């Protein structure tokens, strides 16, 4: 029986690691990618021992030109046919766009726009030829909320949502299913919250555990869902927040001093 392979980016911790574990539990061999060299090697050993699968851990910076082609070429050289591509790698910062450092802006654009697009392009071509494959792109609930402080982040995630929906239409007739996931807050180290606050947020339904999100995401992918906004709290609150006038949002941001806004 031919081995099934999945590729997960940003897989050294958090949601990416949860995706890797979920796919490993379903019998997939793994290519896992991260810009944290020691962590990705350790996670590779951990996953291989726990699930009895073959794991190729790759130390790569996906926020630079040519990263996607290099990753694709590595899989080709090692004769690894990717059946499942999970574009999970990402970054987050909270500040006014023009206050961010230029290199950080460029890094986010590569990580959220250029590299995932190119990975879909290269691996999508192989899937199209085989007439079988799955692509899961990670957008965000914030793609509907381009507010001060997260303007660039929300906009790049909006791109991923739109790109995924269009690519899905192009590939469905070739047996390739593209799903976009738009999660809200997830209990990872991204927000620098204490464990007690994370636990409270999970109980209130404001946050979701990465393992739960990964299971929902992979289930949606294999059920050929176009998109998924997981969590009852997110489904209820997102439409309400979208109704807020931008003038009110600016006033809240200015009053709370979350970001510095010019009058």
Which sequence ranges carry the predicted segments?
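SDR active-site lid
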Residues: 170-232
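Conserved NAD(P)H cofactor-binding loop of Rossmann-fold oxidoreductase domains
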Residues: 88-93
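Active-site helix of classical SDR
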Residues: 120, 156
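Residue(s) in the substrate-gating loop at a strand-loop-helix junction
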Residues: 140
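Conserved glycine-rich cofactor-binding loop
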Residues: 5, 10-13
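Conserved glycine-rich Rossmann-like NAD(P)H-binding loop of the short-chain dehydrogenase/reductase
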Residues: 26-42
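Substrate-binding pocket helix/loop in short-chain dehydrogenase/reductase
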Residues: 96-97, 101-109
């Amino acid at each position: 029986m031919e081995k099934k392979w999945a590729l997960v980016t940003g897989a050294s911790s958090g949601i990416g690691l949860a995706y890797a574990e979920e796919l490993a539990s379903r019998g997939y061999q793994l290519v896992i990618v991260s810009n944290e060299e020691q962590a990705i090697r350790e996670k590779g050993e951990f996953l291989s021992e726990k699930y009895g699968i073959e794991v190729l851990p790759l130390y790569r910076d996906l926020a630079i030109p040519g990263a996607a082609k290099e990753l694709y070429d590595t899989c080709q050289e090692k004769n690894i046919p990717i059946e499942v591509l999970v574009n999970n790698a990402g970054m987050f910062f909270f500040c006014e766009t023009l206050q961010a450092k230029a290199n950080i802006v460029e890094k986010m654009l590569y990580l959220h726009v250029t590299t995932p697009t190119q990975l879909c392009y290269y691996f999508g071509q192989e899937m199209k030829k085989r007439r079988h494959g799955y692509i899961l792109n990670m957008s965000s609930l914030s793609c509907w909320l381009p507010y001060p402080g997260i303007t660039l982040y929300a906009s790049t995630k909006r791109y991923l949502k739109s790109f995924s929906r269009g690519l899905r239409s192009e590939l469905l007739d070739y047996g390739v299913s593209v799903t976009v996931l738009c999660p809200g807050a997830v209990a990872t180290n991204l927000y620098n919250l204490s464990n007690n606050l994370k636990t409270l947020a999970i109980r209130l339904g404001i946050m979701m555990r990465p393992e739960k999100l990964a299971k929902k995401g992979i289930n949606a992918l294999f059920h050929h869902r176009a998109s998924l906004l997981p969590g009852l709290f997110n489904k209820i609150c997102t439409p309400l927040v979208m109704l807020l006038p931008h003038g009110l949002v600016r006033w809240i941001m200015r009053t709370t001093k979350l970001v510095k806004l010019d009058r």
